[in-house]
Regions:
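Beta-strand-turn-beta hairpins that frame and shape the catalytic cleft
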Residues: 22, 35-41, 131-140, 152-160
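Active-site neighborhood of phospho(di)ester-bond hydrolases with catalytic His/Asp-centered motifs
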Residues: 42-44, 67-81, 97-101, 161-164, ...
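Active-site-proximal loop/helix segments of hydrolase catalytic cores
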Residues: 145-222
Length: 273
């Protein structure tokens, strides 16, 4: 268990309300599980062997059958979505799914894979630039610069942002025209969050971008009020987090970035949060 930066929380506590119990588990890659007082939110879970050439080891914990669980999938890529999560409805009758509309689950498709088509009644499909209310969750979606959506979610007095694949994807060889278009689209979306409170954010820091690994992360930190930011989409290489924090001259900005060391790492929020 890692208790998140009590000193930072102490400095900042006058700026925000106490939100009660919150615990976060980094499952793997871009999957995070958020436990609140009366519910569990799970973002972009997939089984660890579904991505070719990778073996992710994170596992979802078990809960009481009547637990309220909300599973988010930002888009259909194999490292963000796994059809088998729909089978969890057999174990948890109070589960609800929030899926980007690019995820296709027709009744015929579900039946073909041995999943009860009735599970569709537990799915809310979302599109970019919209707002949704699911039970007591308020959800705003942003448009990804790759596929699907990013999620801004508020519940229990907590504001969360999960970027999905929304990032400043600058690739060598893509050319200035394409990279510039992606950057403008990315910044346009992130600026929609500039006036939003964000207690916790999950944002890409992809080492495959090489020298551009931190560009999107920089812009996100500088243009939002996110208090704790978890790097993600790191393909099991977490070395960039320490490097990035050392590069930041502003200590308070560096303190906002959470250091992840391993899959299934748990982060408990202290009393002052």
């Amino acid at each position: 268990y890692t208790t998140l930066f009590r000193s930072f929380a102490e400095r900042e506590k006058k700026k925000r309300k106490r939100v009660g119990y919150m615990q976060i588990i980094f499952i793997h890659h871009s999957c995070f599980l958020v436990e609140l007082d009366d519910k569990v939110l799970i973002f972009d879970y997939f089984d660890g062997d579904k991505v070719e050439g990778m073996h992710f080891t994170g596992k979802l914990p078990s809960y009481e059958p009547d637990t309220k669980i909300y599973m988010f999938a930002s888009h259909s890529h194999k490292d963000h979505y796994d059809m088998d999560i729909l089978r969890l409805a057999d174990k948890y009758p109070n589960i609800h799914y929030i899926f980007s509309k690019d995820i296709r689950i027709s009744p015929h498709f579900l039946s073909k894979h041995g999943i009860d088509p009735a599970v569709r009644d537990k799915v809310t499909f979302v599109s970019p630039d919209n707002t949704y209310h699911v039970d007591d969750l308020d959800i705003m979606t942003l448009r990804s610069t790759d596929a699907g959506v990013a999620f801004y979610v508020t519940s229990n007095g907590v504001s969360l942002f999960h970027a999905g694949d929304l990032n400043d994807w600058e690739w060598d060889g893509a050319g200035d025209l394409i990279n510039g278009r992606v950057r403008r689209a990315f910044r346009h979306e992130i600026k929609k969050l500039s006036e939003k409170p964000i207690n916790v954010a999950f944002f890409p820091m992809d080492p495959k971008l090489m020298e551009y690994q931190f560009k999107g992360f920089d812009f996100f930190l500088q243009n939002t009020s996110a208090e704790f930011v978890f790097p993600m989409h790191m393909w099991q290489d977490y070395s960039g987090i320490t490097e990035y924090k050392k590069r930041l001259s502003n200590k308070e900005m560096a303190d906002r970035v959470i250091e992840i060391e391993r899959e299934n790492q748990t982060f408990a929020f202290g009393e002052n949060y």
